[in-house]
Amino acid sequence: MIKPIVKDILFLGQKSEEATKNDMVVIDDLIDTLRANLEHCVGLAANMIGVKKRILVFTVGNLIVPMINPVILKKEKPYETEESCLSLIGFRKTKRYETIEVTYLDRNFNKKKQVFNGFTAQIIQHEMDHFEGIII
């Protein structure tokens, strides 16, 4: 189900909790909401649709990839960039890493470990910041 994007900074500033199998419907809601916003958005964290759980989705080409309880294990090659967010107006400066290694659960709760580079790595870092209440 397509959900409205949360813009309440006080809500978005709160930390998210670990997701469980009971939160599976959130993945479908995130995917539906991202599809509805693809013109302006490449990723979403669950708190952006009002759910304080550690779930995110992002685009890779035509695919939408969900990540449950992701953790960055390694990060390399820091750089400065500017980002925008559906929850905010305009662009903000931030620090990101060119390469990250992430462990996460897929939508079937299978554990995965993967290396991401470039813009995909940037999207994942941005969405994971939401879990910590960090809004670029």
Curated annotation (Swiss-Prot):
Biological processes, Gene Ontology terms: co-translational protein modification; translation
Cited InterPro entries: Peptide_deformylase, Peptide_deformylase_sf
Sequence similarity: Belongs to the polypeptide deformylase family.
EC number(s) given by UniProt: 3.5.1.88
Reaction it catalyzes: N-terminal N-formyl-L-methionyl-[peptide] + H2O = N-terminal L-methionyl-[peptide] + formate
Name of this chain's protein: Peptide deformylase
Keywords, in A-Z order: Hydrolase, Iron, Metal-binding, Protein biosynthesis
Residues that hold Fe cation according to the record: 85, 126, 130
Any one Pfam family match given in the protein's UniProt record, by short name: Pep_deformylase
Enzyme class: hydrolase
Superkingdom classification of source: Bacteria
PANTHER family from the UniProt entry: PEPTIDE DEFORMYLASE (PTHR10458:SF22)
Co-factor binding details: Binds 1 Fe(2+) ion.
Active site (record annotation): 127
The keyword Flavoprotein is assigned to this record: no
GO molecular function, one term: metal ion binding
Coiled-coil regions, chain positions: none
Cofactor dependency: Fe(2+)
Keyword Iron: yes
Biological function: Removes the formyl group from the N-terminal Met of newly synthesized proteins. Requires at least a dipeptide for an efficient rate of reaction. N-terminal L-methionine is a prerequisite for activity but the enzyme has broad specificity at other positions.
